[in-house]
Amino acid sequence: MAKSTPGAAAPIEATPQYWDEACRHLARRDRVMKKLIPKFGETRLASRGDAFTTLARSIVGQQISVKAAQSVWDRFAAAVGGRSTHLAPGRVAALKVERMRGAGLSARKCEYLLDLAGHFVGGRVHVAQWAGMDDEAIIEELVAIRGIGRWTAEMFLIFHLLRPDVLPLDDVGLLRGISHNYFSGEPVSRAEARELGEAWAPFRSVATWYIWRSLDPLPVEY
């Protein structure tokens, strides 16, 4: 058996095993989901399979467009070296700020990425234990890292750990999609979204993914 290293994530399945069950549940419980789910065929949520890279991409993408985020990410990954889908925390930690800024990162995002790398290199995140921890415990651990708030932690739960029942109420796209699909475009409060999401449990991550897809047919990835 190979030895684990600090920050090394356990293998994550590429797609959730619960997906088909979740789709059946949602179609039974929600008339909008019953119409939405068949529109997207066999496409489903997929994990990149690397914890550090997923979190780093979330930081890079904060407050900029998807297109701009991809451009900055590609330049940043090239500066780090290695595969852009599996960046090594140690290489990021050793990167000079000037090179990071040259990739298009703000000074603040450079600080965040270096702090993230430091947590992984120093073993201050308990990656090997995440599989046995509940969602809120993981969120608490992640938000201790600079630049990671609750929204970023929830995206990580959905896109990396493939947790089935996350409802990211701070996500603008989710609220916009609920407004479009359920309230004829009228503004939706977090409380209304939470109440609607009760019917989706225990598969609120899956419902959220389909709501996102209703706004943008391209699969969402982090």
Predicted regions: what is each one?
Residues M1-T43, E111, A131, D135-E136, ...:
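C-terminal accessory module of base-excision DNA glycosylases/AP lyases that mediates lesion recognition
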Residues E13, I64-R146, A201:
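Alpha-helical ds-nucleic-acid-binding substructure associated with the helix-hairpin-helix region
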Residues C23, M33, E42, G49-F52, ...:
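Generic secondary-structure boundary/loop-capping signal
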Residues R28, S47-R48, S84, A88, ...:
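A generic short alpha-helical patch detector that favors 3-5-residue windows
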Residues D30-T53, R57-S58, S65-R83:
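A positional/architectural concept
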